[in-house]
């Protein structure tokens, strides 16, 4: 397996292009199943999870064509992909593909809405606690679907005449369930109302794409989304939003090294909660013509408390990076994880580097230390792995991050982007 070797202590200075948002791209790719026309997506990131979704869509008969890179005012806007599901060759999403990524379950709603049936393996992905698909299933059942779980598969069929609109109240906020049901409702009969819906920018991005395909959707970005079903949707062209998690990650990397970077393409409105909390830690965000400039205010990094929350709160996908940042703060920080269980697996690895962290249930108390020390560490999931990279950038000596295949699931060319800003690091490719 590949590893990253990092020699820390060098401030990051320069500009970093922000890639298209993985968490927007995956549901947008699944949306191609809703139409026999061509869905063209620009600013597609080059990631392992994107490849997994492409392989899954190909299994369903989708014709996939990559057309290089689109150019825009800010330079390269990522890859452009054309997805055409003229006919659905299979309504089964097999275990060998779905096990690699939990977002694969997003084909369930589109397949069921268009074909009247779907057989989707229960999903895999990062090992960070349970993420049951119950909310997806209950929502589709409210729309008239018959669903059973057998042999590790969700087996669903729509009623005669197709899915029907319904009022669906989520007992808890779920991004994936909101996306799945919004796509299914776009082809359902009548009106669907999603109450306590997720409000993430990725939800709004999906809604904008579906509207371009002919869907009728109101309220995306609020907790009440209204969808009026259409008989059919058409193809469309859509540009994927920049990745707010990558934006926050590189902002924290710049801050922990005492550097200054411009995040090209980043949007402040997507990370307001992050910018507000980091401002309390003495980190400045400045909007520029190209994106955002990030730097420490007075050279000191102050400890600040953080609780993860659904958008517009602080994202759980930045919790591990925030913990790494707080390891060298002045004072202490209490970090509370309210979204997922078992998401502190990076703590023992940060401790190997000299971090002072005590876990109490869903909270971790981080007491700042003057300096972290390089060490061999092991990545356990996507966001934990990048927190170790952030820590390594600031640590004295050499840090080796093992099992970085997790990183490739969510960060495009991360070592290239960091090296371009002065980081001393390289990928070591294992041949065995």
Curated annotation (Swiss-Prot):
Record's GO cellular component terms: cytoplasm
Broad EC category: transferase
Ligand binding (phosphoenolpyruvate): 22-23
GO molecular function annotations of the record: UDP-N-acetylglucosamine 1-carboxyvinyltransferase activity
Active site: 126 (proton donor)
EC number of the protein: 2.5.1.7
Keyword Cell cycle assigned: yes
Subcellular location: Cytoplasm
Record flagged with keyword Protein biosynthesis: no
UniProt binding sites for UDP-N-acetyl-alpha-D-glucosamine: 102, 131-135, 317, 339
Pfam family membership, one: EPSP_synthase
2-(S-cysteinyl)pyruvic acid O-phosphothioketal modifications at: 126
Recorded family membership: Belongs to the EPSP synthase family. MurA subfamily.
Protein name (record): UDP-N-acetylglucosamine 1-carboxyvinyltransferase
Organism: Rhodospirillum centenum (strain ATCC 51521 / SW)
């Amino acid at each position: 397996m590949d590893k990253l070797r990092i020699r820390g202590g060098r401030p990051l200075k320069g500009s970093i292009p922000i890639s298209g948002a993985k968490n927007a791209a995956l549901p947008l790719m699944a949306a191609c199943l809703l139409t026999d026309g061509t869905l063209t997506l620009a600013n597609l990131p080059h990631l392992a999870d994107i490849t997994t979704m492409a392989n899954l869509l190909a299994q369903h008969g989708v014709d996939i064509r990559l057309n290089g890179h689109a150019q825009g005012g800010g330079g390269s806007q990522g890859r452009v992909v054309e997805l055409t599901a003229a006919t659905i060759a299979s309504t089964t999403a097999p275990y060998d593909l779905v096990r690699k990524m939990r977002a694969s379950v997003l084909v369930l709603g589109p397949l069921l809405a268009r074909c009247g049936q779907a057989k989707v393996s229960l999903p895999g992905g990062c090992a960070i606690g349970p993420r049951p698909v119950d909310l997806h299933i209950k929502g589709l059942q409210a729309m008239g679907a018959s669903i059973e779980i057998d042999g590790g598969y969700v087996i669903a069929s729509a009623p005669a005449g197709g899915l029907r609109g319904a009022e669906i109240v989520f007992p808890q906020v779920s991004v994936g369930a909101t996306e799945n049901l919004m796509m299914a409702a776009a082809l359902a009969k009548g009106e669907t109302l999603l109450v306590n819906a997720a409000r993430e920018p990725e939800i709004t991005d999906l809604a904008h794409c579906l509207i371009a395909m002919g869907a009728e959707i109101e309220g995306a970005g609020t907790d009440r989304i209204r969808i009026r079903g259409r008989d059919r949707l058409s193809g469309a062209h859509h540009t994927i939003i920049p990745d707010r998690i990558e934006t926050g990650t590189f902002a924290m990397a710049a801050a922990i090294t005492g550097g200054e970077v411009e995040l090209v393409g980043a949007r402040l409105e997507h990370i307001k909660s992050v910018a507000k909390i980091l401002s309390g830690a003495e980190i400045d965000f400045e909007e520029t013509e190209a994106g955002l400039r990030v730097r420490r205010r007075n050279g000191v990094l102050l400890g600040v408390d953080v609780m993860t929350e659904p958008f517009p709160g602080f994202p759980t996908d930045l919790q591990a990076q925030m913990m790494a940042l707080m390891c060298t703060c002045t004072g202490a920080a209490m970090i509370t994880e309210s979204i997922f269980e078992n998401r502190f697996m990076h703590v023992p690895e940060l401790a190997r580097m000299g971090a002072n962290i005590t876990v109490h249930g869903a909270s971790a108390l981080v007491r700042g230390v003057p300096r972290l020390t390089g060490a061999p560490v092991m990545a356990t999931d996507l966001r934990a792995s990048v927190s170790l990279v952030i820590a390594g950038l600031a640590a004295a000596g050499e840090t080796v991050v093992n099992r970085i295949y997790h990183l490739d699931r969510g960060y495009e060319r991360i070592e290239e982007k960091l090296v371009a800003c002065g980081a001393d690091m390289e990928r070591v490719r294992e041949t065995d």
